[in-house]
Amino acid sequence: MAFATIDVTKGITGVTPVANGGTAISSGFKNGVDPRKNAQPLIINGDMAVAQRGTSFTSVSSGANFPVDRFEFYPTNLGTYTIIQEALTSGEAYNNGFRTALRIDTTTADASPSSTDYAYLRTKFEGQDLQLFKKGTSNAEKFTLAFWVKSNKTTTGQVNLFDIDNNRLVSGTYAISSANTWEKKVINFPADTTGAFDNNNALSLIVEFFLDGGSNWTSGTAPTAWEAQSNGDRNVNNFDLAGSTDNDWAITGVQLEVGEFSSTTIPPFQHESFDDNFYRCLRYYYDKP
């Protein structure tokens, strides 16, 4: 077997580095360099590939439910749902390398929720994994969240970053333009010079996709700058998932990046091997045979 030879000025023989006139990878990179500050994806199982608890749950109406690892769907008597790990076989998310998604279908509608009722999907972070954001310092970094989403509804949804350590919140919105079509969304959130994330293994941050809720969650104003958390601000742009049994919502390819990126500059999703993804999930849940 012949092995490639290494040249300190050219790298692998026959390949010219960028510094010597080679061609840089352009999508999400600058001068051929990945702009990420993190070596691994900050969001674990963002491609929805690992589902230790099962791949389909029916008659879901309350409590914490995990159709895939690290993503928790939590309704409180606001509609009834089927939640699944969906296998993808076509569409733009599939064309971009995603083979699984988390899908929520409304099976019993509730178009008039009680004031305290809600339904959201969330994923959580330890503070020690968030220190690159330098939150609470004068050098605080912006946040960029990206994901693929599909629904029968053409409407606007709200996603929140919820700082548990300091009880602070900031919100962003995404618009679904075409029904039943995978669309990629990129949302920027501002830096926060107030309130550092604790540097430990306790819960510090929640990324929260609010999908429905009563007036206690819709009565405020969605904050575009970090502020003290108020429940009334968390679902101002109500997606109304429970409003009809025709409604569904699916998501995959969720990534959180340090810094501000656009749809053209955001680094590619970090596809891990299934084993690497699975072992990171085991830190939080182990389904013993």
How would you label these PLM feature ranges?
Residues 28-289:
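Extracellular and organelle-lumenal recognition/adhesion modules and their flexible linkers in secreted
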Residues 1-13:
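Short, intrinsically disordered N-terminal pre-domain segments
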